[in-house]
From Swiss-Prot:
Subcellular location, record wording: Mitochondrion inner membrane
CC cofactor note: Binds 2 heme b groups non-covalently.
Amino acids binding heme b b566: H98, H197
Protein name as catalogued: Cytochrome b
GO biological process annotation, one example: mitochondrial electron transport, ubiquinol to cytochrome c
Length: 380
C-alpha cells in the first residue's frame, strides 16, 4: 500500500501534525478561537500592508500626499487602507481577549508559551506605534515626538538614545525612513515568533476550561476545530469589513487629517485607543522617569503571572472570588482606557491615579491573596 503523502512528506507531515491530526481537548470553548483569529489578522495586515507599501513614499514632503493619493487614485486603495488601519484595531481586540482568556483559565502555567506570547504583544505594540507615524499627519508626528521623548527620562544615556532613535535633533525625515523600515520588518518578526509560540504550545498541548489533563479525551483538530475556526473568521471579518466600509474613521483621530506641522501642537495628544490604558498609567505619575517605568511595568507585569499563581486550581472556573476580581480588573482597564482619552484635568487625573494603583494592586497582591483564601476554603 502506498504511504499517505500527508503523513510521510517532510513538510506536509509538519502541517498535518499542527493543523489536521493535532489532538485537541474536546471541551475547548470559543475563547480558544482567538489564536487562529490573530493568525488571520496578521495575514490580512501583511497583505494589505504590502499593497500599501507599493504606493507609499517614506519622505516627510511626500508621505501624507502619497497616502492621500493611494486613497483617491489607486484602484480600491481607500479600501486597502481602511482595512489595514481598522485591521490593527481588530488585531488588538483579539490579542487582548486572547490574553484575558489565558489569564482566566491559567494558561500562563505553560511558561514558555506565555512568555513568547508576551514578547509577541510587545512586538505588536512596537509595530503599531511605528506604523501610526507613517501617514505623517499631526497626531502621527506629535505621537512619535512624545513617545520617543520618553526615553530621555533615563539618566545619563537617555538623551543620546533619543537622538540616536530620531537620527537628528527632532523627529524628521530620518525618523520617518527608519520607522517605515521597522514597520516593514516587524510583522515578519511577529510571524517568526508566532511559529515559536506555536512550537511551545504543541509541546504541552492546549489547556482547557477545566484546567485538567485532557489526554484521555482528545479529538482531531480537523474537521472539528478547523470548521469552528472558519466560523470565527467569518464572525471577525464581517465586522472588520463593515467598519472599513461604513465608518472607516470611527476609531481614528481627526487631527491626523492635517499634515504634520512641528510648529503647531495639537490641543490633546493621545495615541490610538488600544494604547490608552498604558498612556493613562504613564500620565497618572507626575514624575517623568516614574511614569515611563510604570508604563513599562503595565505590560511587563504579564511576565509575572506564572510566579504569582498560588491557587491549587489552575483555572478560575470554580473560583468565584477570583472571578469577581478578574472582572473588576477588566472594568479597571476599561476605566483606564476611557481616562487616557480625556484631557489632563480634574477629575480625570485622580480617577487615572486610582485606577492605576488598583491595576497593580489587583495583579500583584489581591489575586495571590484571594487564591490563598480559596485554598483555605477548599479544606472546609
Amino acid at each position: 500500500m502506498a504511504p499517505n503523502l500527508r503523513k510521510s512528506h517532510p513538510i506536509l507531515k509538519m502541517i498535518n501534525n499542527s493543523l489536521i491530526d493535532l489532538p485537541a481537548p474536546s471541551n475547548i470553548s470559543a475563547w480558544w478561537n482567538f489564536g487562529s483569529l490573530l493568525g488571520i489578522c496578521l495575514l490580512t495586515q501583511i497583505i494589505t500592508g504590502l499593497l500599501l507599501a507599493t504606493h507609499y513614499t517614506a519622505d516627510t514632503t511626500l508621505a501624507f500626499s502619497s497616502v492621500a493619493h493611494t486613497c483617491r487614485n489607486v484602484q480600491y486603495g481607500w479600501l486597502i487602507r481602511n482595512l489595514h488601519a481598522n485591521g490593527a484595531s481588530f488585531f488588538f481586540i483579539c490579542i487582548y481577549l486572547h490574553i484575558g482568556r489565558g489569564f482566566y483559565y491559567g494558561s500562563y502555567l505553560f511558561k514558555e508559551t506565555w512568555n513568547t506570547g508576551v514578547i509577541l504583544l510587545l512586538t505588536l505594540m512596537a509595530t503599531a506605534f511605528v506604523g501610526y507615524v507613517l501617514p505623517w499627519g499631526q497626531m502621527s508626528f506629535w505621537g512619535a515626538t512624545v513617545i520617543t521623548n520618553l526615553f530621555s527620562a533615563f539618566p545619563y544615556i537617555g538623551q543620546t538614545i533619543v537622538e540616536w532613535a530620531w537620527g537628528g535633533f527632532s523627529v524628521d525625515n530620518p525618523t520617518l525612513t527608519r520607522f517605515f523600515a521597522l514597520h516593514f520588518l516587524l510583522p515578519f518578526m511577529i510571524a517568526g515568533l508566532t511559529l515559536i509560540h506555536f512550537t511551545f504550545l504543541h509541546e504541552s498541548g492546549s489547556n482547557n476550561p477545566l484546567g485538567i489533563v485532557s489526554d484521555c479525551d482528545k479529538i482531531p483538530f480537523h474537521p472539528y476545530f478547523s470548521v469552528k475556526d472558519i466560523l470565527g473568521f467569518m464572525l471577525m471579518l464581517l465586522p472588520l469589513t463593515a467598519l472599513a466600509l461604513f465608518s472607516p474613521n470611527l476609531l481614528g483621530d481627526p487631527e491626523n487629517f492635517t499634515p504634520a506641522n512641528p510648529l503647531v501642537t495639537p490641543p490633546h495628544i493621545k495615541p490610538e485607543w488600544y494604547f490608552l490604558f498604558a498612556y493613562a498609567i504613564l500620565r497618572s505619575i507626575p514624575n517623568k522617569l516614574g511614569g515611563v517605568l510604570a508604563l513599562a511595568a503595565s505590560v511587563l507585569i504579564l511576565f509575572l503571572a506564572p510566579l504569582l499563581h498560588v491557587s491549587k486550581q489552575r483555572t478560575m472556573a470554580f473560583r468565584p472570588l477570583s472571578q469577581l476580581l478578574f472582572w473588576t480588573l477588566v472594568a479597571n482597564l476599561l476605566i483606564l482606557t476611557w481616562v487616557g482619552s480625556q484631557p489632563v484635568e480634574h477629575p480625570f487625573i485622580i480617577i487615572g491615579q486610582l485606577a492605576s494603583i488598583t491595576y497593580f494592586l489587583t495583579i500583584l497582591f489581591l489575586f495571590p491573596l484571594t487564591s490563598a483564601l480559596e485554598n483555605k476554603l477548599l479544606n472546609f
